[in-house]
Amino acid sequence: REVIKKKITLIDYENIRDVSGEGYRYLGFGRFAGIIGTYNTLNLYIKLYNKQPLSRVFEINNYEQIKKIISKQNFNKIKILLTGSGRASKGAIEMLKHANIKQVSINDYLNNKYSEAIFSNISAKEHIERKDGKDISKVKNYLFDTDIFIACHYWDPKFPKLFFPKHINEFK
């Protein structure tokens, strides 16, 4: 309401595209979206397990300090699945590594037991399967042994859903 009242113009930079007809985006979620989103996700995980939550990013406002804070946390045997191969996922991976969470292949993620925190980053080839409109998402096949799912892949409202809320209880 305040935006309308003050006649503020809002621009969704994510949707500014070239005029060639190809639809290339000029801007997209970048590295810092992945960094901050992952920090906030890990902080929520800490809070959910009744530990003292970390300072919020806007309160710290210093990347070196953020890295220092997250590196002191112990995430035990947490398993994180991450999608995407762009700037946001690279930022997310950067933050997970600062949190001392080890990256493993999807094969190792699914088939091995670890005594430390791990994550796997899967590409579209590994989580999208079919073109005929049927059950195209393979993500739900990976979530049965996943504590946190971080979606960093490009998304469009026309894309099929990776899983539905009704599936969440199946993953427990």
Across the structure, where does each feature detected by a protein language model lie?
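Generic secondary-structure signature for well-ordered alpha-helical cores
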Residues: K5-T9, N43-K51, I93, K97-I101, ...
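Glycine/serine-rich phosphate-binding loop and adjoining beta1-alpha1 elements at the start
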Residues: R1-I78
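ADP-ribose/adenylate-binding Rossmann-like module
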Residues: R1-E14, I148-K172
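Predominant activation on well-ordered alpha-helical scaffold segments within soluble catalytic domains
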Residues: T38-L42, I93, K97, K140, ...
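Glycine-rich phosphate/diphosphate-binding loop of Rossmann-like nucleotide-binding domains
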Residues: P53-D145
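Short, acidic Gly/Pro/Ser/Thr-rich loop/turn segments
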Residues: D18, S89-K90, P157
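A short secondary-structure junction signal
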Residues: E22, G91-M95, K161-L162
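Short low-complexity, flexible loop/linker segments enriched in glycine and/or proline
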Residues: R25-F29, I118-N121, K166
